[in-house]
Amino acid sequence: GETIISKNKKPMQGALQDFTDQGWKVTNILNSMNLESMLRALKPHTPNGSVWAGALSYDLVQWTQPILLQHPPAEGEILAILWLVDSWDESEVIIPEVANTVRVEGEKSSHSDAEHAEIVKKIKQSITAGELYQLNFGRTWTGPLKEDPSTIFHRLAMNNPAPFSGYIEAADLGIALASSSPEILLETKDGEVMTAPIKGTRPRGSDPDQESLLRRDLVHDRKERAEHRMLVDLERNDLGIVAQPGSVIQSRFDVEAYANVQHLVSQITGELDDKKDGIDALQALFPGGSITGCPKTVVCAAIDEIEQKPRSFWTGSMGWIDVHTGDSTWNIMIRTLEARYSPEGWQGTVVAGGGITIESNPEAEVAEAIWKAAALRRACGWLNPEAISLPKGELGIYPLYLEQQPFIPEQRFDLNIAFIDNLDSFSHNIIHALKSFGCDVDVLDGRGGITEIDHDAVVIGPGPGRPEISPLSMHAASLDIPVLGICLGHQAIGINRGMKLIESPLGPVHGVPSNIISNGNGLLREGKHVMTRYNSLILSGNGEIEVTSTDETGVLPMEIRDGDTYGVQFHPESIGSPNGMLVFAEFLKRASHC
């Protein structure tokens, strides 16, 4: 479907309330055009030292991404709940003993297993067509609850402990959220910013040997590693929106073991730009890339089209923020029960899913979603205790080798670069790379009109879809100044020189380091290079341009050159491109001599 890009939206409305003898009373109405401005509007109402704590629904995506939802929440639906906290105690809480689960009938699923598998196939077709790289689809289970949601949360805390768990209940609104989340979206403190995305999953083993085998299988699984690499590149990009150039790094890479599952987890850190704070960071990162996909803007629109309903609080965030300092901590609400109260009692909603890539097996994705939801469904009483029995284990962390290695530029270039942003989730990684070499970078909207480019050089950025959707990219491909096209930009250059763009006959490749064979006439020196690819479409045929690098088969053009115009069908900025920064260095060196 079509991604509807819009920056002209209805404002989000917030109601400030005070608690009185008659209950909660509205004292002020706040209207804001995005999440950041809504939080800043709370400053006059927030004493120094106090924080706001609560939950943000995923559907606030309407005010963090430039899209219009086709299936928005109903008018007046609760999108966020925040309480002003003046003081708090830190203490050890003893979880009360919880009775055995009460079996409850009446659970319903939003999709049958067959329907779920067909959606996976449909997403893979979109990946093949070059519309996106990866998408996280959620399947929903709903049913009545015969226990208070707080009891279910205590059961989860006992049976499925997780580091970013939390419980929220707004009795007057009839909403309760019981989150047993292992994932942090964002932490900001004293000018530092951190996120720790999770992607890649295996169950726990029934014994230490099986546990080790499953962990090793996870670490060496091509699909899981590619998906995780893609997510790390995405989150580096999102942190790059608010961080100082050169400060964003992958600081940790581990397998983390929780009660029933093992995950690949990376920690990505950065230093906030002097003009940015934790509110800006939340605006940039929300919702988390691990539960949307890539490129984020396009997949958020695609999720809306495929799931055909609001997500509500699932994959939103629970946490707190100091609106004066910007210090904050937010989780991602996966492994979360959303409960709503009505005269008939509590009704529960549980959602689970996974990231769909070109290498996803539909039946395996269905099975993964089912066992991810099993612990919550069992805690709600919707599954028999013996159903979908999963091995359990102690929490553990197993460090892995970091792919991203530090890079210190040997040369700086006093160049003014125009960067054309084509709605990709890696754009800011490229911008940071250029700035790390001393360049000034002006960012131009690839979906905007053709504008004059009076710069020393231009970099046409990657993005979903075909390059023809960006008239500015096609225009820049013909300029008589140094040009570097990356992925979509590379394709724009090839089309401009008479080549055709087709679906790759060897299939899509996303997040996978690939061997690139160069003849030495382009930006790469002669020989073999390892670079990460994110492409489904490929240039084909003869054109008025030289192919300077191919894939290992010698069939697919990976690098092209026409004078001072260069195109690369790989991503030099990725953590999976060990010497990718040298590509930028060589281009800038040549541009500085023009």
Model-predicted segments: where are they?
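Short, hydrophobic alpha-helical segments
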Residues: 377-380, 384, 496-497, 587-594
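Short, glycine/acidic-enriched loop or turn micro-motifs at the edges of active sites
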Residues: 236, 424-425, 574
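Extended alpha-helical targeting/anchoring segments
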Residues: 1-409
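Gly/Ser/Thr-rich beta-alpha loop segments that engage phosphate groups in nucleotides
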Residues: 56, 132, 291, 295, ...
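Short beta->alpha connector loops at strand-helix junctions that form conserved
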Residues: 251-252, 445, 461, 503-506
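Amide-donor transfer/coupling interface in amidating biosynthetic enzymes
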Residues: 404-418, 448-454, 468-484, 502-594
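Flexible gly/pro-rich beta->alpha loop and the following alpha-helix that scaffold active-site loops
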Residues: 416-420, 424-486, 491, 497
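Short glycine-/acidic-enriched loop or helix-start segments at secondary-structure transitions
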Residues: 62-63, 144-145, 241, 324, ...
